[in-house]
């Protein structure tokens, strides 16, 4: 399972003219399930997303997770957006292959599981809409972007 996380000042996702999720300071995570991923793999990735230290402490070092973005216990927002294209195989030719991505039904199940688990562990969780054409707007903070990937 893959998450491309970006530290943001704010971010929102729209489907058509409807905002489906919006956060202030926190993380935007583009999330993709790969073939063979399980709930355990999703749990492992979520622990990494929630614990990854990408926010600056008082000394200016990236030392704080989204659950404590100011060092005083304030949680940042977590905007989760499904994006199967992260699993693309780009090794041959000029057209990506999406064979490594989980099939749509399994991808949706794992994304929904990931969102539910995130909501159980984190105060501020917003989402896009699985399988929809979405427009994502964000203001990067840094920019700070990391590719996180977990496997069984």
Swiss-Prot record:
EC number(s) per entry: 3.1.1.96
Single Gene Ontology MF annotation: Ser(Gly)-tRNA(Ala) hydrolase activity
Recorded superkingdom: Bacteria
Biological process, per Gene Ontology: D-amino acid catabolic process
Motif (Gly-cisPro motif, important for rejection of L-amino acids): 142-143
Keywords: Cytoplasm, Hydrolase, RNA-binding, tRNA-binding
Keyword GTP-binding among UniProt keywords: no
Chief location bin: cytoplasm
Subcellular location: Cytoplasm
Signal peptide: none
Gene Ontology CC terms: cytoplasm
InterPro entries: Daa-tRNA_deacyls_DTD (IPR003732), DTD-like_sf (IPR023509)
The reaction(s) this protein catalyses: glycyl-tRNA(Ala) + H2O = tRNA(Ala) + glycine + H(+); a D-aminoacyl-tRNA + H2O = a tRNA + a D-alpha-amino acid + H(+)
Domains: entry comment: A Gly-cisPro motif from one monomer fits into the active site of the other monomer to allow specific chiral rejection of L-amino acids.
Described function: An aminoacyl-tRNA editing enzyme that deacylates mischarged D-aminoacyl-tRNAs. Also deacylates mischarged glycyl-tRNA(Ala), protecting cells against glycine mischarging by AlaRS. Acts via tRNA-based rather than protein-based catalysis; rejects L-amino acids rather than detecting D-amino acids in the active site. By recycling D-aminoacyl-tRNA to D-amino acids and free tRNA molecules, this enzyme counteracts the toxicity associated with the formation of D-aminoacyl-tRNA entities in vivo and helps enforce protein L-homochirality.
Subunit structure: Homodimer.
Family according to the record: Belongs to the DTD family.
Record-given protein name: D-aminoacyl-tRNA deacylase
Species of provenance: Paraburkholderia phymatum (strain DSM 17167 / CIP 108236 / LMG 21445 / STM815)
